[in-house]
């Protein structure tokens, strides 16, 4: 739902105030719409973690909230993103791994981030030893 607020000053009568207010609100609702970003599936592909206790980390997006755009311009919105193919451990939750931008007629309307959804610790000696022992026991 889109909310619009109109402030009218200096109206000559209550009838004029309501008439002008209705025109202003009709104009706003008739001229604009809410655009909710459609994030491509490729953005959510996991990223490989080098030297981590986990092989990969899931990703999420931040700052990709809906925005108001001129009505009918939805098909002209373009999405561009860049993200790391792999990253070295440690990785903290919320760590920036890329950017995602939405543009309308060349003007940036949304500038978001691609971030790690989980933390991945750097592999240590104890973890590596435990992993080796577990693999030996599974033979």
Where do the language-model regions lie?
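Domain-terminus/edge residues, biased toward the C-terminal soluble/receptor-binding domains
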Residues: 1-139
